[in-house]
Amino acid sequence: MDTKTHSLPITHTQLHSNSRPQSRTCSQCTCTHHRQTFSQSCRQSQRGSRSRSSSQSPATHQNPTGAHSSSGLQSQSPNASPPPKRHKKTMNSHHSPTRPTILHSSCPKNRKNLEGKLNKKKMAKRIQQVYKTKKRS
């Protein structure tokens, strides 16, 4: 029984690492609607992770997330499965069709950042070329 409880936090960290790229894509975009809806879901996941990490001694609190991935205890899995399902439904219904347009066309700050990076690269190349030509002559 001890080995099962030790393996559960590992699956919990794997589940969290899968959800992190979504928050990274959200932090890049500065659109207000996208940030508001995603920040709410981020807060919910942070609340859950805080409560799980603070109460590591009772194994019953960690079992729902472990049971979701390893299907060890099915009686407690309904307690943990509704929040991820709600999160996924909101992401699919609101953001997946609009996410490409948000990242590319409707976020002017994102576009400016990309243009700035390209301009910096161009300027670096120009400076290097000028430096090389001055050295030769």
UniProtKB/Swiss-Prot annotation:
It holds the Pfam family TP2. Keywords: Chromosome, Developmental protein, Differentiation, DNA-binding, Metal-binding, Nucleosome core, Nucleus, Spermatogenesis, Zinc. A motif (Nuclear localization signal) lies at residues 116-124. The keyword Metal-binding applies. Testis. This is Nuclear transition protein 2. Plays a key role in the replacement of histones to protamine in the elongating spermatids of mammals. In condensing spermatids, loaded onto the nucleosomes, where it promotes the recruitment and processing of protamines, which are responsible for histone eviction. One of its GO terms (biological process) is positive regulation of protein processing. GO terms for cellular component: nucleolus; nucleosome. Residues 39-57 have a biased composition (Low complexity). It comes from Macaca mulatta (Rhesus macaque). Belongs to the nuclear transition protein 2 family. It is found in: Nucleus; Nucleus, Nucleolus; Chromosome. GO terms for molecular function: DNA binding; zinc ion binding. Zn(2+) binds at H12, H16, C29, C31. Coiled coil: none annotated. Its main location: nucleus. Residues 1-31, 58-79, 93-108 have a biased composition (Polar residues). Residues 1-137 are annotated as: Disordered.
